[in-house]
């Protein structure tokens, strides 16, 4: 009786089975690596979007803080008394004098001095509207526009020390938007004052020399603009 020869036919299939499993494992690992790489890229994109959203939220919160600050003085635009406050004889009661609002300041250094002068005048005549430092800062910020308004937003954050410090806010505003021409004029004034002071001191020295009879007064270069002043005698230097 002839036995069926199945062992030789099954051996190639058994040998191919481990190779197929190995290929499946390799394919699975490759797929996992690709998936992991894609997830990492997606996570990086999400982190970038989160950072952008955080920045946008901070900007919105800063603008909201600015709007809330402006809303703290609801009567700032009402300068003259309302009609209901007119008395029966048609006259208005004694109140603070009507004062026009300061012109908005957008960051032009040449207009800063005039803007601050208008602010001082308004706050003097409308002092009852500004009981504290925060109200003063809030009103000043409400008159800023453009670049100056953007500059003020960080200083209106809850943790900013300038939010409740009017003089400090003014100092920082002046430091940021000071006029170069105004600074040059002040430097020239200081230089001229120093020169005038030197002339007065030399004139006093001349009078002392004349009273002591030690000789003529030395010429100061500023008096004729032609030659430098000669050296003073030893006795004059000791006076």
From Swiss-Prot:
Pfam families: DUF4939
Biased composition (Low complexity): 228-239
Keyword Amino-acid biosynthesis: no
Isomerase found in the keyword field: no
Coiled-coil regions listed: 29-69
Keywords, ordered alphabetically: Coiled coil
Residue span of region Disordered: 82-106, 214-239
Note: RTL6 is one of at least 11 genes called Mar or Mart related to long terminal repeat retrotransposons. They do not correspond to functional retrotransposons, but rather to neofunctionalized retrotransposons genes.
Family: Belongs to the LDOC1 family.
Identification of the protein by name: Retrotransposon Gag-like protein 6
Organism annotation: Homo sapiens
